[in-house]
Design a protein with these regions (language model features):
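Carbohydrate transferase catalytic cores enriched for Leloir-type hexosyltransferases
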Residues: 1-349
Length: 349
């Protein structure tokens, strides 16, 4: 019998130094794309790890499969190497693609010269050597072009998505909230508390908006100073996080700088009304499915918006209805297909 057409297999090396342990949005992104990419028979994958970083078992566990090839050095026969971790962290002669999630080390440079160099060097290496740079928003594309001096022809926008667990409430067993929040109205903040997250503005605005303490302010990570009425639900898993979104009277995202904004998309997917700062990539992701504060640092504007939305069930209902439809416009399958197309293109250059 005649043989069928043979697949032209592209050998991709992946910088996997952080694959098993990164619990941030970057790790979620890398695992979401790679678990889907591994199903494509046109590609062969080698995961490059280093001393003291995850070995084969850890990478296999992170990707949910034993069919992984792991190496300590970039294979000589790799056609392309992908760096998912916000820049390039090792040198290689293999043609490379790097993902840049934001340009925060340049927008908010450290005052310490050594720390600044450590934070910025992977971005500079990317700007100097990567054949293509993947970003998740037009905002980040503009940041990479203007802050790093990259030709826009080298930049490809591949919007992210959210996992299927982030959905509106379904019929069946009701969500079980942490005991501290049961029977209470609460505003939810999801994420870290570094400078650009602007949590201090939210805390100050919340205190002005709800001085009687009849509304709780819930955090998924402990802020530097826990305000009156503050509740910490530390590091919830995805199922617990989805329940927190669904139970929230409002999700508040005051960040002044986001390359994409996972919490915004997750909240919308769960049908939670969202109030966010009109900053960074957040408006690009949220569109008309979120309410916006124009000046991210304006405490009075935040307080007024919090009060108004908590008092207006109809307005929050409109946002809750728009959110899932907006979130459905984002797809991991499309993000993966776009990523693979770029890797294939660079391997063929």
């Amino acid at each position: 019998l005649p043989e069928g057409p043979r697949l032209n297999v592209v050998h991709v090396a992946v910088d996997a130094h952080n694959l098993a342990r990164d619990d941030r949005g970057i790790g979620r992104y890398a695992r979401a794309v790679l678990t889907r990419a591994l199903r494509d028979e046109r590609f062969r994958w080698t995961f490059v790890v280093r001393d003291l970083f995850p070995k084969r078992a850890a990478v296999a566990h992170a990707l949910g499969t034993d069919a992984v090839e792991v190496a300590r050095r970039v294979p000589r026969d790799a056609g392309v190497m992908w760096f998912p971790w916000n820049g390039m962290f090792l040198r290689t002669d293999v043609p490379s693609v790097a993902t840049v999630h934001d340009a925060a080390p340049f927008a908010f440079p450290s005052g310490d010269a050594r720390k600044r160099a450590i934070e910025q060097n992977p971005f500079l290496a990317t700007a100097n050597t990567a054949r293509r740079i993947l970003v998740q928003s037009r905002f980040t594309a503009d940041e990479v072009e203007h802050r790093l001096g990259v030709d826009p022809e080298r930049i490809v926008v591949t919007p992210l998505a959210v996992d299927s667990i982030f959905t509106p409430a379904q019929s069946g067993a009701p969500d079980v909230l942490p005991v501290e929040l049961r029977g209470r109205r609460y505003v939810l903040h999801v994420g870290a508390h570094d400078e650009r997250k602007n949590t201090g503005t939210l805390i100050a605005a919340f205190a002005r908006a709800f001085p009687a303490g009849d509304v709780a302010l819930a955090f998924t990570r402990r802020p530097p100073s826990l305000p009156a009425g503050g509740v910490v639900i530390d590091a919830p898993d995805d199922a617990a996080l989805a329940a927190l979104y669904r139970g929230a009277a409002l999700v508040a995202l005051p960040s002044t700088y986001e390359g994409f904004g996972f919490p915004l998309l997750e909240a919308m997917a769960c049908g939670a009304p969202v109030l966010a700062a009109r900053a960074g990539a957040l408006p690009e992701v949220g569109g008309d499915a979120a309410a916006w504060v124009d000046d991210a640092h304006d405490v009075e504007a935040w307080a007024a918006a919090l009060r108004a939305l908590l008092a207006d069930d109809a307005a929050r209902g409109v946002l809750a209805a728009r959110g899932p439809a907006r979130a459905a416009e984002f797809s991991w399958e499309r993000c993966t297909a776009q990523t693979l197309a770029v890797l294939e293109e660079v391997a063929a250059l």
